[in-house]
Amino acid sequence: MPPNLTGYYRFVSQKNMEDYLQALNISLAVRKIALLLKPDKEIDHQGNHMMVRTLSTFRNYTVQFDVGVEFEEDLRSVDGRKCQTIVTWEEEQLVCVQKGEVPNRGWRHWLEGEMLYLELTARDAVCEQVFRKVR
C-alpha cells in the first residue's frame, strides 16, 4: 500500500535547479528569481485523489488529480505550456509523466521518515529537492 503523503513540508535543499529550468527554456530573469526561492509543499492525499500545492513568495501552483487518470495540466503559470499528465504509484514513489513540448518531463515524490524528496526531470536535466514535514 502506498504511503499517505498528506502534510505540510518546508524546503530544505535543492540541486541542479538551474539546469532543470534551462531544459524548460525558462528565461534568464525568471531563472534568477526561481533560484532564490525556497518553496514549501502542501499535500492533501485522500485515497486516489491528491492535491499538491507549491507555495513561494513569487508564485504559487496547485495541481489536483486522481492517481492513474490522465488529465490536461495547465502549466502556463509555471512555464507557459499545457501538457497531458498522468500520475501513478511505482512502489512507494508517486511518479508523474508530463507529455508535451518538452521531452522526458515529469517528477517523482517519495518519503524517507519525515523528509519528502522530489525529483524533477526535463530533457536530460534532473533537479532534486528535499523538504521536511512540519505538520
From Swiss-Prot:
Subcellular location: Cytoplasm
SUPFAM superfamilies hit by this protein: Lipocalins
GO cellular component entries: cytoplasm
Pfam families tied to this protein: Lipocalin
Annotated keywords: Cytoplasm, Retinol-binding, Transport, Vitamin A
Organism domain of life: Eukaryota
Molecular-function GO terms, alphabetical: retinal binding; retinol binding
Record InterPro entries: Calycin, Fatty_acid-bd, ILBP, Lipocln_cytosolic_FA-bd_dom
Xref: CDD domains: CRBP3 (cd19464)
Signal peptide per UniProt: none
Family: Belongs to the calycin superfamily. Fatty-acid binding protein (FABP) family.
Recorded domain comment: Forms a beta-barrel structure that accommodates hydrophobic ligands in its interior.
Function noted in UniProt: Intracellular transport of retinol.
Protein name per its UniProtKB record: Retinol-binding protein 5
Organism whose genome encodes this protein: Pongo abelii (Sumatran orangutan)
